[in-house]
Amino acid sequence: ESRCWIDFNFYGHQIVAHLATDEFKNLQTNFVDGEQISCRHFGVILGWKEWEGLSKKLNRLNVNYLITPRIRFENKVGEQGTFFIEDPSGNVLEFKAFKNDSDVFKKF
């Protein structure tokens, strides 16, 4: 950690954020289940109850979502709760939980 970068504890994982002189804007997106998803994002998979609790907490804090908490691929393989937020440096973060943990890497 220094004046130019910081490490964040991200559910036991490390996100390293560096200051940059150029801004990263107009990121490319892809269409997924009715939403435009940032191609460049970091995701974490939580347990279903943990995801529900976090989304409720962030709602109470009036967090600005890029994509609000929702269920994606409902009643299909890969059913998941998901939401996207942006950190102060513009990094896109996805928080998700799968209805069935065995679906995490299944194609859907």
Question: Model features per residue range: what roles?
Answer:
Residues 26-28, 35-37, 43-47, 66, ...:
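Short, surface-exposed, polar/charged, turn-prone segments marking secondary-structure boundaries
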Residues 18-23, 37-38, 84-91:
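Short, structured secondary-structure boundary patches
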Residues 12, 21, 46-48, 87-89, ...:
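Non-catalytic surface loops within mature trypsin-like serine protease
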Residues 26-30, 104-107:
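A short, polar/proline- and glycine-enriched secondary-structure boundary/capping micro-motif
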Residues 1-24:
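Core segments of cupin and vicinal oxygen chelate
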Residues 6-9, 29-108:
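Vicinal oxygen chelate
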